[in-house]
Amino acid sequence: MTELFSNENIFLNQSFEDQNEAIEKAGQALVDAGAVTEDYIQAMKDREAVVSTFMGNGLAIPHGTDEAKSAVLQSGLTLLQIPEGVQWGDDVAKVVVGIAGKDGEHLDLLSKIAITFSEEENVDRIVNTKSPEEIKAVFEEADV
């Protein structure tokens, strides 16, 4: 999974007015990486309008609806570190991982990210690091 995380797709020390702005940033990063078309950003917002992608432990994983499969060009991940947090419905997200999975890979990606974030120590390291390499190391050490 760490092969999908490039330093260019890890954004440290971000701040956002609201979850919609964070979704736009995550979606645009996926567009810029060549993983999705622009349509995918709206699909991420559409999913969020139906069901929150907040997973607990300060983590939100916005991703597109099933109808947006055609907007996914290749699997991709982007991570936004938000030390001060952003309001996400009734919760506060400190890490937002935007995902796009090709050929059903999104379920595997969701599972691996959720497992990594189930450990409070991993969450703390990701929220507080100043290095993209450290974030990748957390996922590698979680061995997911």
UniProtKB/Swiss-Prot annotation:
PTS EIIA type-2 domain segment(s): 3-142
GO cellular component terms attached to this protein's record: cytoplasm; plasma membrane
Transmembrane regions: none
Annotated GO biological process: phosphoenolpyruvate-dependent sugar phosphotransferase system
Keyword tags: Cytoplasm, Kinase, Phosphoprotein, Phosphotransferase system, Sugar transport, Transferase, Transport
UniProt-annotated catalytic positions: H63 (tele-phosphohistidine intermediate)
One Pfam family this sequence matches: PTS_EIIA_2
Domain of life, per lineage: Bacteria
Compartment(s) where it occurs, according to its Swiss-Prot or TrEMBL record: Cytoplasm
GO MF entries: kinase activity; protein-phosphocysteine-sugar phosphotransferase activity
Phosphohistidine modifications at: H63
Residue ranges of coiled coil: none
Subunit structure: Homodimer or homotrimer. Seems to be a monomer when not phosphorylated.
Role played: The phosphoenolpyruvate-dependent sugar phosphotransferase system (sugar PTS), a major carbohydrate active transport system, catalyzes the phosphorylation of incoming sugar substrates concomitantly with their translocation across the cell membrane. The enzyme II CmtAB PTS system is involved in D-mannitol transport.
Domain notes for this protein: The PTS EIIA type-2 domain is phosphorylated by phospho-HPr on a histidyl residue. Then, it transfers the phosphoryl group to the PTS EIIB type-2 domain.
Identification of the protein by name: Mannitol-specific phosphotransferase enzyme IIA component
Naturally occurring in which organism (per UniProt): Staphylococcus carnosus (strain TM300)
Lineage of source species: Bacteria, Bacillati, Bacillota, Bacilli, Bacillales
Name of the encoding gene: mtlF
